[in-house]
Amino acid sequence: MNNTEFYDRLGVSKNASADEIKKAYRKLSKKYHPDINKEPGAEDKYKEVQEAYETLSDDQKRAAYDQYGAAGANGGFGGFNGAGGFGGFEDIFSSFFGGGGSSRNPNAPRQGDDLQYRVNLTFEEAIFGTEKEVKYHREAGCRTCNGSGAKPGTSPVTCGRCHGAGVINVDTQTPLGMMRRQVTCDVCHGRGKEIKYPCTTCHGTGHEKQAHSVHVKIPAGVETGQQIRLAGQGEAGFNGGPYGDLYVVVSVEASDKFEREGTTIFYNLNLNFVQAALGDTVDIPTVHGDVELVIPEGTQTGKKFRLRSKGAPSLRGGAVGDQYVTVNVVTPTGLNDRQKVALKEFAAAGDLKVNPKKKGFFDHIKDAFDGE
C-alpha cells in the first residue's frame, strides 16, 4: 500500500486539512453505511473509509502514515490502549446514527435544577406592584460536610476505577469490528472522586433539603401566568456548578368590581331609568380612587365612557391604560300604585302606547286568595 491510498479512499489530497478530511468522511460514511446502502460491496467500502479516517483524523497516526505507510500508522495506533481509541470516529458516527460514546464530560461542573413557585396577588397588588417573601425548600450544599459528601474529618479520594476522569472505556464487539465508547464511571458516577466515608447527613450526595426564603419585587402591571426569574435561587449545582434559578409564577385574584385585559380595566355601571333618562353625576370607583362621571340625558344600555389613565400600567413602561365604564339601565320591579300611575301619565304625555295584560276571571280569584 502506498502512502496516498487512505487519501484516495476519502477523495482528498495529501495536503487536505482536518476539516476537509472530516467532511469527506462524513459524506462517504453516510453513503456506504450498511444500514443505508444495501448494494453489494457497500459494506467493504464502508470499512475502507472507516480505516482511512481512523488514521488520517489522528495527527500522530497521520504523520506516521505519511512517513511509513499503513504499517507505521498501525504501530503508532497501538491497539485499543488509551482514551483516544476511536474517539474521533465515534463522534462523527454519533452525529449521523446516534451511536457511539458521549463527548460530554460527566465530571464537569453542572448548574443545579430550576424551581418554580406560585405567588398569589390581589387585583390591586398586580396593578401597583408589591414585594413578597417567598418561602420554600430546596436542595442546597450540605452544612455538615460543606458539600463534599464526605464525613467530617475525611476527604473524597481519586476514583480507583476511572482515575479521576469520571468516565471509563468500554470495548464492544460489533459486526464491523471492535468498537470503543466512553461511559460514565459506575463507581464514582462521573465525579472522579470516591467517598470512602459518606457524610451521615447527606449520605454522600453533598446536598440536603433546606428551608430557604427570598424577597421578590413584583413589578407593577403583572398578569396571571407571567414569571419572574431569580437567578441562583434554585437548587444546588453539581461538581461545583452554580445554583439553578427560581421562577416565581404570578396568579392574580379576580376582582369583585373590575375586569382587566392588559392595561385596560372594565367596570359595569348600573343606572336606574330616571338617571338614564334625565342624566346624573355619579361616583365611579377606579383602582386609583373614585372619580366623578357626568351621565348625559338619554343614556342607553351599552353606552361606554372612557376614563383616561385610570387603568393598569404597562410592564414595558410608558403611559397607564384606561378604564371603560359600560352602562346597564335597570328596569324597576315591584312598583307601587303611585309609581304605576306616574308611569301611565308619563306614557300618555309622550303618546306612548302601553297595553298591559287585562286580568281575567282566574286572575281575580288568584288575587282574592293572595289577599287572604
Curated annotation (Swiss-Prot):
InterPro entries: DnaJ (IPR012724), DnaJ_C (IPR002939), DnaJ_domain (IPR001623), DnaJ_domain_CS (IPR018253), HSP40/DnaJ_pept-bd (IPR008971), HSP_DnaJ_Cys-rich_dom (IPR001305), HSP_DnaJ_Cys-rich_dom_sf (IPR036410), J_dom_sf (IPR036869). CDD domains: DnaJ, DnaJ_C, DnaJ_zf. CXXCXGXG motif repeats lie at residues 142-149, 159-166, 185-192, 199-206. GO terms for molecular function: ATP binding; heat shock protein binding; unfolded protein binding; zinc ion binding. Its cofactor is Zn(2+). SUPFAM superfamilies: Chaperone J-domain (SSF46565), DnaJ/Hsp40 cysteine-rich domain (SSF57938), HSP40/DnaJ peptide-binding domain (SSF49493). Zn(2+) 1 binds at residues 142, 145, 199, 202. Keywords: Chaperone, Cytoplasm, DNA replication, Metal-binding, Repeat, Stress response, Zinc, Zinc-finger. It is found in: Cytoplasm. Binds 2 Zn(2+) ions per monomer. NCBIfam families: DnaJ_bact (TIGR02349), PRK10767.1 (NF008035), PRK14276.1 (NF010869). HAMAP family: DnaJ. Belongs to the DnaJ family. Participates actively in the response to hyperosmotic and heat shock by preventing the aggregation of stress-denatured proteins and by disaggregating proteins, also in an autonomous, DnaK-independent fashion. Unfolded proteins bind initially to DnaJ; upon interaction with the DnaJ-bound protein, DnaK hydrolyzes its bound ATP, resulting in the formation of a stable complex. GrpE releases ADP from DnaK; ATP binding to DnaK triggers the release of the substrate protein, thus completing the reaction cycle. This is Chaperone protein DnaJ. It comes from Streptococcus pneumoniae (strain ATCC BAA-255 / R6).
